[in-house]
A protein has these predicted regions:
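Receiver (REC) domain switch/active-site residues of two-component response regulators
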Residues: 62, 192, 402
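N-terminal leader/targeting and accessory segments in enzymes
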Residues: 1-88, 92, 267, 299, ...
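Residue-level signal for inorganic ion chemistry
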Residues: 6, 37, 56, 89, ...
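ATP-dependent carboxylate-amine ligase
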Residues: 1-14, 35-38, 289, 312-322, ...
Length: 495
């Protein structure tokens, strides 16, 4: 590839140096540069790729993409936004793989993982070759690959989409985070349908305000045009939660056809006659495609919303409502989402990823509907993240639980004790007496304490980390899995 060829992809770009210079590949990490690569200098929050241009040159880089000219002696493409340039170049290098697949994106504060997993199950059971990208990693071709972020960067995004397509993938179900939208990670991805779950407080450490957070989520819908791979009826769809007022704004900013879901009578896909149990949920769905009875092996109102979102998206793809109901009857939730841990104990232990005020309240309110005995809640809040939600989550835990055990989540670079004090403030504000809550910084000991306290009929909720297999302390990821630790604690008690 020549620099002049790549520069034509980028609005307002100019080439300093030889426009005929050839590059063989693309890199954004100087450590991974190979001879002949184009190194894209990405300015970040903690590090600036421009500072690593000389290292990239020593590694053999043939040219650079920069936001400001550098004195390296290498030819450069100078652009206004290196992240957007990376996305455009990545699409070109990997041959626009999303145009060869049916990509359905899911965004929202809570429910992204479950909705994408439900969609993956529905379509795989229908005989389609499917792939998943999200918090739990990337899955296709019968294999799972770990990732650091919910949505990988633009270069990795296009590389994985190309690998998926070359493996025969027909449908890709993708979690799309607000960070990814704000930072251009999904720029150039040709979404066929975009799904919105809900918007509640989270990530204010990054976005600053709820308005900015909402605006980032809205980018998925404002960019959803009517070109390239549309659904069988020739349209692209925005699938929106009718019970979340933000959906009205998203509907007004998209060129796509909108389909709504929820409990509201105005929803295009609506659930009623809902019956909850610890084993699952029964309900009826009425829709523009008819009505059907559903029984899903997932618990709680929030999972009815997740099933509605997946159903609405599947209907947009032309699937029959009765087929969707049949597929969801055998669906499993995403790992670490309301996942039970059983080792013969006479009480229920649930591990859930709930790490926002809304998700914690959803899980605890669901448990309160069927719990026969006391509810024990083990949780903490992550470090280097939105501090304002800490006392809010403390109040929620105290409101719905009989006993709260505060512990570390991923403290990252913060003092774990300082985080716990901020959460404890909310517990006290809710009026929970000190005799009803414990502060145990060591997460393993906190889980063991809850298991030891539980009696027959009680429920222990271990919230915040879900599927994660590590605990991040002082920048180091230490192996830790709530599910494994809980099972070990149960087995010790049952001996």
């Amino acid at each position: 590839m020549r620099l002049e060829e790549l520069s034509r992809l980028l609005v307002g770009a100019r080439v300093n140096g030889d426009p005929a210079a050839e590059v063989k590949g693309v890199a954004v990490d100087s450590r991974s540069v190979r001879p002949g690569d184009l190194f894209i200098c990405i300015p970040g929050v903690r590090q600036d790729g421009h500072d690593y241009a000389d290292h990239a040159k020593r590694q053999g880089a043939a040219a650079l993409v920069v936001e400001r000219p550098l004195d390296t002696g290498l030819p450069e493409i100078v652009v206004k936004d290196a992240r957007h340039a990376m996305a455009a170049i990545a699409c070109h290098v990997y041959g626009y793989p999303s145009h060869e697949m049916k990509v359905i994106g899911v965004t929202g504060t809570n429910g992204k993982s479950t909705v994408t997993h439900l969609l993956d199950h529905i379509f795989a059971e229908q005989g389609a070759v499917t792939g998943l990208m999200g918090t739990l990693g990337i899955k296709f071709g019968g294999r799972q690959y770990p990732t650091l972020n919910t949505t990988v960067d633009a270069l990795e995004m296009q590389r994985w989409l190309r690998l998926m397509r070359d493996a025969g993938t027909e449908y890709c179900f993708m979690e799309v985070s607000s960070h990814a939208l704000a930072m251009g990670r999904v720029k150039g991805v040709n979404f066929r349908t975009a799904v919105f779950t809900n918007l509640t407080q989270d990530h204010l450490d990054f976005h600053g305000t709820m308005e900015a957070y909402k605006a980032a989520k809205g980018l998925l819908f404002s960019r959803l045009g009517n070109t390239f791979s549309a659904t069988p009826d020739g349209r692209k769809y925005a699938v929106l939660n009718a019970d979340d007022e933000v959906s009205r704004e998203f509907a007004n900013c998209t060129a796509a056809h909108t389909v709504t879901y929820g409990f509201s009578r105005e929803a295009d896909v609506r659930a009623d006659r809902i019956r909850y149990s610890p084993q699952g949920t029964r309900f009826r769905i009425e829709s523009f495609a008819g009505e059907a009875e559903f029984h899903i092996p997932l618990v709680g109102k929030f999972n009815v919303y997740n099933a509605l979102a997946a159903t609405a998206a599947a209907l947009c793809e032309g699937l029959a409502l009765s087929d969707i109901a049949g597929r969801l009857a055998t669906a499993k939730g995403a790992e670490g989402r309301f996942q039970t841990v059983s080792a013969g104990q006479p009480f229920l232990v649930i591990v859930d990823y709930a790490h926002t005020p809304d998700s914690l309240e959803n899980v605890l309110s669901t448990i309160s509907e069927f719990a026969e005995g006391r509810i024990y809640c083990v949780f903490g809040c992550g470090g280097d993240r939105d501090r304002t939600k800490r006392p809010v989550m403390g109040r929620i835990a105290a409101r719905y639980s009989d006993c709260v055990i505060l512990t570390s989540d991923n403290p990252r670079t913060e003092d774990p004790r300082a985080i716990l004090e901020e959460v404890e403030r909310g517990i006290r504000e809710e009026g929970m007496p000190s005799s009803d809550y414990y502060i145990i910084e060591d997460r393993g000991l906190a889980i063991e304490k809850a298991v030891d306290l539980a009696s027959p009929g009680d429920v222990v909720l271990i919230a915040g980390k879900g599927h994660e297999t590590y605990q991040e302390i002082n920048g180091v990821r230490i192996p830790f899995d709530d599910r494994v630790v809980a099972e070990q604690a149960i087995r010790r008690r049952m001996q």
